Amino acid sequence: MPLRSDSENFALIRVIGVGGGGSNAVNRMIRAELMGVEFIAVNTDAQALLQSDAPNKIRIGDKITRGLGAGGDPSIGQRAAEEDSEKIADALRDSDMVFITAGMGGGTGSGAAPVIAEIARDMGSLTIGVVTKPFTWEGARRRLNAEKSAELLRDKVD
């Protein structure tokens, strides 16, 4: 039986930041020099994606958003992730564990995170969601979006 190299003995862990809030979380982890993890940023907003420190970036929903973001609409974020599900699956292939981080309440994070979680789990990865909720001052619409999206995500993660 051949011996495995050191890199083969560790779980392949990926952290995927979805939308603005998720990308901010990934940036903080990278700046804190978290090791042993691959970072990916996913966004519908081309400008925001350029600001990400993540070495792997996936722009989703170009046909729907033309790179201009989801405009706070989770249904656009969902459709964007569905449109580019193959790009997402390619980035997550062979992952042992996937952490999905997103801010709930906006468009891309709220809508795309459940789709990405479903892709990761269907590929056999242990799938964990880590999300933030909006502040009270952000309003009822964002709070309702966050509640609905968090419930959808809860059903797609382990």
Residue positions per predicted region:
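Tubulin/FtsZ superfamily GTPase core signature
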Residues: 1-158
